[in-house]
Amino acid sequence: MPAQLLGDHVRFRFTPADAGVTGVVLQCDRAVPGGREFRRDADRGGWVLDVPRPALQRVEYRFAVERGDDIEVVTDPGNPVTVRTAFGDRSVTEMPGYAPPWWLGAPAVPGRLDPHTLSGETTHEVPVTVWTPADLADEDPAPLLLVHDGPEYDQLAAVTAYSGALVAAGHLPPHRVALAHPVIRDAWYSGSPQYLRTIAAAGLDGLEARYAVRGRVVVAGASLGGLTALLLGLLAAPRVGGVFAQSGSFFQVRHDDAESGHRYFGRISRLVQSVLDMRHAEQPLVVGMTCGALEDNAANNRDMATALHRAGHDVTLTEVADLHNYTAWRDALDPCLTDVLRRVWDHGG
């Protein structure tokens, strides 16, 4: 049976197919309140766990099923609703009122995907796959959106489906989406000066040599990719006119002790502090940010939005009732990314 919302709590149930189960533990984000260990249900058999209803639209979870010293991590066999994530499949329970974005089922312009590589200062070339509306020729001028973690953003957050649907609906002009591949993700997406300079200079030069780019570029990303999008925007302005950062990893010593073991935490926190300390923007950006109100990055995203606004950037931070995952990022693309794209591309873009 899928998880049930029963008034002020959610009930999870696990009915094993064998008698050897000795314990069941709920695996989910710590933003979900309550305990994690199931109890035996003497009345109905199996195992049951009640947790307070979280202030979330969706909960992604798995079960850790114990058989003595052996532990098997599984999706909920009683729940047919699952989601692909960057870390494997998860079961999902959706709260009343949740709905996927309208554009997922809407008509969309077809597109084509063309692979490229960008060369510069990085030790490895940067692979980039460019999505283009099928009826848009390479020499036709069109705006450009560059997305970090591009393949995952497309597979798990449907970013090119979003673009195709928004173009078909007339909400966005025909545009191209450059999906950047994270070959050495932690190194590149932690403020690597070589990576940032590669994309800001030779990378954008290469894309503009291949395609007719109209106006200012918008760069996007999530988590470490959100940090990278912001740093790239600050470096490459005014060539880059807009930034869209989702759940950006704007690590600070005072907020993010849990991340202090990250290999590049020192570099990230120093770069973040330098942005927080800025008082004036020579080239103001349009910055859209989204973050789960209950996720670990919420405090550092609020600080970053405040600092960017103080420096003169045009900033909108939208907090959502979800967490650090691609479905949350997908669900916030419209209107949050749409607003950034329209404002950059309609005014000098």
Residue ranges, per PLM feature:
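Non-catalytic cap/lid and distal C-terminal segments of serine-dependent acyl enzymes
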Residues: 1-35, 41-349
